Amino acid sequence: MEIVKMIFVLAAFILFFLLLNKLEKSEKLNSEFIRKILHIGSGIGGLTLPFIFERKSSVVILGIVFLVLLVSIRIVKNKVTGFKKVLETKNRKTLGDIYFIMSILGLWLVSSDNKVMYALPLIILMLSDAFAALIGEFYSKYKFNTGFGTKSIEGSVTFFLTTYFICINFFLFFSDIGSINIVLVSLLLSILTMILEVISWNGLDNLFVPFFVYMFLRLNLYLTEK
């Protein structure tokens, strides 16, 4: 039964990727927007894993297959497939998609038994990063150099606000800590992850942010107790 589930998930991802590739070729949507659709879609897929699979080994195998596919897309000549354009833009070369799959795989191995500890890092990565990137791409006026690249104040503020909203709601529903503590913990986590996102480079925020959130929760286990 697990093998059937694996084939279904793999087929769904391939169809999703082919659809995005078609949209990219049609030039109806901005390349960055398409990348973030892939980002959010991958995150949603990752969030469903604890509800689909019973064995950790199934997701490990699936994750390895995804990594091989993504690496292969980058190796094969882009003129032949055109798939690489879905993963990166002309002005931004990144390995973020590979790091994203690695994050899902890593979080699955260490926290799949605790759905809150597994889900919160992924949701922050999925939504905060995507919204920040889109705001930074289309609406930014104030940019700054981090030493690793260029970021925007608007994008960083968006990352902070989105993370804060996510944390507030998660701790409200999945924790017994008091309201004041929820506000303070959410504020602290939002500030720290925003800083981490700012100083990350080449898509490494897709690794740094979720694992930092996981370690934060692991060191403060009472935050996930209800």
Model-predicted regions and their roles:
Residues M1-A11:
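Hydrophobic transmembrane alpha-helical segments in integral membrane proteins
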Residues F13-F16:
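Glycine/aspartate-rich loop-and-adjacent alpha/beta segment that forms the canonical ThDP
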Residues I3-V4, L18-V59, V71-I166, F173, ...:
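Interhelical loop and helix-boundary elements at the membrane-water interface
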Residues G63-I64:
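Eukaryotic helix-linker segments that join adjacent hydrophobic helices
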Residues L67-L69:
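A short structural micro-motif
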Residues F173-I180, K226:
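Alpha-helical transmembrane bundle and helix-membrane interface signal
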